[in-house]
Amino acid sequence: MTVCKDFTCKRKRIMMNNRKQINIQYYDSPGGRLVLASFADSLCLCDWSDNPFAERNMRRLTRGMNVSFKTGTTSVLKETKRQLDEYFAGKRKAFDIQLRLTGTDFQNEVWNALLDIPYGATKSYKDIARHIGKPKAVRAVAGAIGANGISILIPCHRVIGSDHSLTGYAGGLEAKKMLLGVETIELYYK
C-alpha cells in the first residue's frame, strides 16, 4: 500500500491544475454505508456516512485547496469497491490501494502505525503509542485514531482498550464488532 501525505505526493504535477476535483461515491457495506472519495490517483476518504465527524473529515480534504466535489466513479474508487467486496467476503487480508492522508505529521505517523497491525490481530492505544516511540502520548494517539478518515483500509477498528474492551469507533461499536468478526477476532466485550 502506498501512502502519500496531504496532497503533496511524489508527483508534483498533480498540483498544477487550477481546479482540482474530488470524486465521491457510496459503498454499502455489511456494517453500514461508507463514503469513498478519490483525488487524482489516490483514495482520500473511506468514512462511515453516519459518522458524527464526517463533515470534519471532508473539510480536512479541502483545506487550502480549490476543489470541487463530483459524484462519479474513478478507477481508484472501482478498485476500492472491488477490494472491499473481497475483504467482506473473507478473501482479502490486505489492501493494495494508494492512499492520500490529510492529517498532521503526528496523525499521519499514527495512521501509518495502524497499517502495521496485521489482519486478525488487535493492538491497544498504548501499544500504538509505544510503536511510534511516544509511550506517554496515549491520549494523543487515541485522538489521532479517532480522526482517521480512511476507515477499514487504515485499520483503526483493530485498536482496542488495554483491558481488551471494545472502544469507540466512527462507524459505531456494532460496525467495529462486525469488522473484527470478518477478521475472525474474538474478544470478550465489556
Which ranges hold each PLM region?
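Regulatory, non-catalytic segments
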Residues: 139-148
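Short cysteine clusters
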Residues: 156
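Active-site phosphate/pyrophosphate- and oxyanion-stabilizing loops and adjacent acidic/basic residues
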Residues: 59, 139, 177
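Major-groove DNA-recognition helix of helix-turn-helix-type DNA-binding domains
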Residues: 153
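Basic nucleic-acid-binding alpha-helical/helix-turn surface characteristic of O6-alkylguanine DNA
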Residues: 2-135, 182, 186-190
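…primarily DNA-binding HTH/wHTH and HhH modules…
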Residues: 162-190
